[in-house]
Amino acid sequence: YKSKIKMESFASLIKNRRSTRKFTDQLLSPEQVEMILKAALMAPASKRKNPWQFIVVEDKEMLKKLAGCKAAGSSFLEGCALAVVVLANVMESDVWVEDASIASIYMQLQAEDLGLGSCWCQIRNRQTEDDTDANTYVRNLLDIPYQLEVLSIIGFGYKDQERKPFDEAHLQWEKIHLDSFKMPEENKEA
């Protein structure tokens, strides 16, 4: 079997996918939304338990409310075309954080492949401006049952800003170790 997909396309995808926090008013097509959600549902999960659930939010009033889910770093949700709230059942899997994270990035990579922008809004272990737990805030807004935890909210839309691709000159190769962990020479104690 020989894959017809060129590896250059994936390398280009990960180099060009950057967080987008400014979106146009253009809505996503149903086909685009379906492709993004399919990517999430195809994501690998430990023991194929698939502990994740997804809430798709297109309602502008709800997006505005969700934008208040954190003290900082969530205001972009008000301007996105739609957001996907990423949940996971903590009773189904002890690695729900990892499984839901993989599904989240699959959606973001699919969006980039479609020419769309996205941005991850971390919810787990974060607080609102009045110090309410962000998970509790989102849970109350969307009537989320107790066994589900909110990991993140991913905002999607057409990009209203262009960002340069990731500069490979900034790759931190010093964080790669061969065969065992090795301290950089300048950090070793004598």
Which residue ranges define each predicted feature?
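Acidic, surface-exposed loops and disordered segments
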Residues: 3-190
